[in-house]
Amino acid sequence: MAGVTAIEIPQWIQDNQGDFVPPVCNKCMFSDQLKVFYVGGPNQRKDFHLEEGEEFFFQRKGDMVLKVIEKGQVRDLVIKQGEMFMLPARVEHSPQRFANSIGLVVERERKNTEFDCVRFLVGSSNVTLFERWFFLTDVVKDLPPLIKEFYNSNEFKTGKPGKGTFACNAPYEARWTDLPVPINRKEFIYDHISEVKNGPVKIYGAPEYKTEVMLLGEGSYDLEAGAVELIIWLQENTFAVVEESGFTYALKSETMVRIKPNTKCLLNVKGGFAITIRMPG
């Protein structure tokens, strides 16, 4: 099926377990319009990241701490095992990962007019010590030179802002907003068992987010990716069938399915639940 790619998550994680420990700590499953990757640890980051898109987090194993700047204050947002969280766009964040933990992250590709920022702060304050704005194409290639530049800077050596703190005017300001609390995935499913029998249930979406995350129960669904990719994430103890362009593909539980842009398919969930993720620009 040219428009559909399916990967069994448990086997994929087992096959790539060497990438979830230092120094790599992550492995990309899909890397086109949607960046779908899993992250391990330990990995205690010192920098904060700022981007114009939203990020979806799910902790498969163990907890993580997402350091955020919320209304000007640095705080620790804990995402526990089994919890989901949608980070709004333009919120400064710094993921802190621990040993023997694995988490899912989904984000979209950047437009050629969008900029990311890597920012270091003075101690535990919200004062900027060093920042660089850049166009992100490949985090593995683009980020290390900026980190190296910081550690070679006078700002790092003195711990005080200086002439090298800012290299340009900020293209945009960080968002000043209250952040939501993480959602326990299993509790959400249990709380919406009756509702999902009547159709898809919104987990995240408009008007708060551009990203659309939906819960699907048993039944048949005509799905269309549209101009962006669509992710179908089969949950535990779920069996489903996807039909696309005359092909039929039986899906096991805990399978991640990518539907390419402008692709239509029929999803038949015969038992259990699925979560879909779409991230327009």
Curated annotation (Swiss-Prot):
Chief subcellular site? cytoplasm
- Record: residues binding Fe cation: H49, E55, H93
GO MF terms on file?
3-hydroxyanthranilate 3,4-dioxygenase activity; ferrous iron binding
Q: In which pathway does it act?
A: Cofactor biosynthesis; NAD(+) biosynthesis; quinolinate from L-kynurenine: step 3/3
* Residue ranges of the region described as Linker: 163-179
Which Pfam families does this UniProt record tie to the protein?
A: 3-HAO
Summarize where O2 binds, as residue positions: R45
Q: Which GO terms describe its cellular component?
A: cytoplasm
Q: Does the keyword Metal-binding apply?
A: yes
Question: Which subcellular locations apply to this protein?
Answer: Cytoplasm
What Enzyme Commission number(s) apply to this enzyme? 1.13.11.6
Task: Name any Gene Ontology BP term.
Answer: L-tryptophan catabolic process
Source superkingdom: Eukaryota
Q: Does the keyword Oxidoreductase apply?
A: yes
Q: Which cofactor does it need?
A: Fe(2+)
* Chain spans, region Domain A (catalytic): 1-162
Q: Where is this region: Domain B?
A: 180-281
The SS bond pairs are none
**What catalytic activity is recorded?**
3-hydroxyanthranilate + O2 = (2Z,4Z)-2-amino-3-carboxymuconate 6-semialdehyde
For this UniProt record, the keywords arranged alphabetically read as follows: Cytoplasm, Dioxygenase, Iron, Metal-binding, Oxidoreductase, Pyridine nucleotide biosynthesis
HAMAP family tied to this protein = 3_HAO (MF_00825)
Cited function: Catalyzes the oxidative ring opening of 3-hydroxyanthranilate to 2-amino-3-carboxymuconate semialdehyde, which spontaneously cyclizes to quinolinate.
Name the chain's protein.
3-hydroxyanthranilate 3,4-dioxygenase
Gene that codes for this? haao-1
